UniProtKB/Swiss-Prot annotation:
Summary of the function given for this chain in its UniProt record: An accessory protein needed during the final step in the assembly of 30S ribosomal subunit, possibly for assembly of the head region. Essential for efficient processing of 16S rRNA. May be needed both before and after RbfA during the maturation of 16S rRNA. It has affinity for free ribosomal 30S subunits but not for 70S ribosomes.
Superkingdom to which the source organism belongs: Bacteria
Protein's name according to its UniProt entry: Ribosome maturation factor RimM
Signal peptide (from-to): none
Amino acid sequence: MKVPEDLVLVGYISGAYGLNGWVRVRPYSADADALLNAKTWWLDKPEFRDVAMMQSKIHSGDVVAQLMGVAGRDAAEALKGATVQIPRSHFPALSDNEFYWVDLIGLEVENLQGVRLGQVSDMMDNGAHPILRVAVPQTSEADPKAAQELLIPFVEQFVITIDQTAKKITVDWGLDY
């Protein structure tokens, strides 16, 4: 088995769906197109392997899918907790000003005044819009009451520019927010 070099973690199996071996996947993105369109998923449970994805659909914000060789609820439940990876080359093309969340993680965040706020550690969806989770750098005399993390809405009002080449996001966000 040749493992693709461009695998990207896109979600995890949260449990079984129904009685016929379907699995429920919690995507790590608001847009699950990559999961829905990939014909092969790479799972890390019970061992790292590729599995053919036979069919899938969105259900209550998750992806439910039928995987080759997973027959029955018990087999699907045994995959609970497995991470799902797919090759980056299988991701659908994006339009201008669209980004995959995985590409934003690790970018530096600074405000319009040029103050470094931290680094994107994760993204989450609050139902209304995505949110940048920014890990705040701690000084040597760290104030125990100081914020460890900033939550910045990922909307045009606050996110001014995203420069993937410079690995930087500029936001309209004050230090006192």
